[in-house]
Amino acid sequence: MTNAASEIGTTTSTVSRQIARLRETLGIYPFVKADGDWHLNPALRDLVTAFEQADGMLESELSRLQSYQPTAKRDVKIGAPPTVLSHMLSQGIREFVKNSPGIRPVLESRILESGLGTTDISVVFHPPESGRVRVKRCGVLDFALFAPKGWRNGDGWVSLGERVAGPYNQARRHFFNSDPTVLVDSFPQAIRVMRDIGVAGALPVIVAAQEPDLELIGPAGLDVTRDLYVIHHETRSTDPDIRATVNWVSTQLTDAKRKTRELREMQNRLCDSPA
């Protein structure tokens, strides 16, 4: 419920009351617990699909009507991990706004979500396994280990929490021979800690490239590459504003992928060069 409340910008008690009312209306529990987590009741999948389809068709029709008002701006909500927003999409936002005067991009940070939630378009690590969602793989987010100049193994390391970094931290514990010295909830926080107390940490390559005082420390076996998928609902595919925004997001991710590869090659050369 905490995650759901955060997703829609309300409190857990409000979510709890809404679920209770929904149960009364439907006559069944809307969610069931399986494998230690809550999932949509399978009996409601067709109902949810019908709502999503109706919502998508309504939004597309509203967009068509707005085309008769050339000065009106339409919000298109784009969800993505914070690094994608700050280091990939933000790079081309000025040109997009200039070329698409009828669209106002609304950027929303989303980390582990796999669906659209309340967004029109999302960039996700894992696309939904079901539902009428269009999926396009068109980018990557590369991670590697970095440290301030002069760092030596044994000086410690910083990590994001287990919810985000957990799948990768066992190998990092083995490399550093210790648990993380500090846990943080964002990469900007990690960079501040790295500078303040001289510890190492895993960072997105595209982020670390803008921090000249941080050096790649390897090893390559601990590098991580995450695919990025652009998703939107199938019923929005004919919506010109959605199409334009999806094309822009896809182009930004593709360009960032190329730049990241170039940065990675340059960092590897610097790391391998004699001191």
Predicted regions: what is each one?
Residues K73-P128:
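Central regulatory/effector-binding core of bacterial HTH transcription factors
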Residues R23-P42:
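A short LG(V/I)-centered, amphipathic sequence patch enriched
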Residues T2-S6, S13:
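Residues within helix-turn-helix
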Residues L116, P128-G198, A202-D227, A256-A275:
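C-terminal regulatory
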Residues T25-L26, L44-Q69, A256-K259:
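Alpha-helical linker/hinge and terminal dimerization helices associated
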Residues L22-R23, L214:
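Conserved amphipathic alpha-helical core elements
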Residues S6-E7, E24:
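Alpha-helical residues within the helix-turn-helix
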Residues T11, Q18, G92:
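Residues within the DNA-recognition helix of helix-turn-helix
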